[in-house]
Amino acid sequence: MATKAQNNETRKVNKLRYAEYYGQQPILDGLYADSKDGRIFKNLMPLILSQKNILQAYRTMKGNKGSHTPGTDALTIENIEAMEAKALCTEVKRRLGNYQPSPVRRKEIPKPNGKTRPLGIPCIWDRLIQQCILQILEPICEAKFSAVSYTHLTLPTILL
């Protein structure tokens, strides 16, 4: 059984691999460098809505165990994986046009001490849209964090 650290490492490597596969890595590296140089970003929507970014977000999300867990709309990754790439991108763009997140499904998760903790499970489309946004904002934000703090960094940043 893989440890939590091994799972995190696998996730980081997959993230880098997916970015390279979809041709996003030069874009993400550019965002990081521009942010590091103090650039102010005004219109990121074209990057967020790009087909490459949407497909990378879908691939990243598809690899998560949680993608098989339904949100309040009862949909899972299986409901959207039959869509062709163009249709998937069109639907994400349509939903992002006037984006309002759906309510999350609440689930109580048992803790070892007998108590529970609340877990919010978003709808599959919200997860996909939020992943699209995260992929573009993450390198911009990472460039702003302290150079001596490594707890928040992802593998591509550490390797720079």
PLM regions and their residue ranges:
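Extended, charge-enriched "interface" segments that sit outside catalytic cores
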Residues: 77, 102, 107
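A short alpha-helix capping/helix-loop junction motif
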Residues: 106, 143-148
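Conserved pre-motif C helix in the palm subdomain of viral-like polymerases
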Residues: 116-145
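Non-catalytic, polymerase-adjacent accessory regions of viral genome-replication enzymes
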Residues: 1-86
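Conserved small/polar residues in nucleotide/adenosyl-binding loops
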Residues: 151-157
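A positively charged, amphipathic N-terminal helix/segment that binds anionic biomolecules
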Residues: 35, 69, 102, 135, ...
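Amphipathic alpha-helical blocks
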Residues: 79-101
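Residues forming anionic-ligand binding surfaces in small-molecule and nucleic-acid pockets
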Residues: 110-113
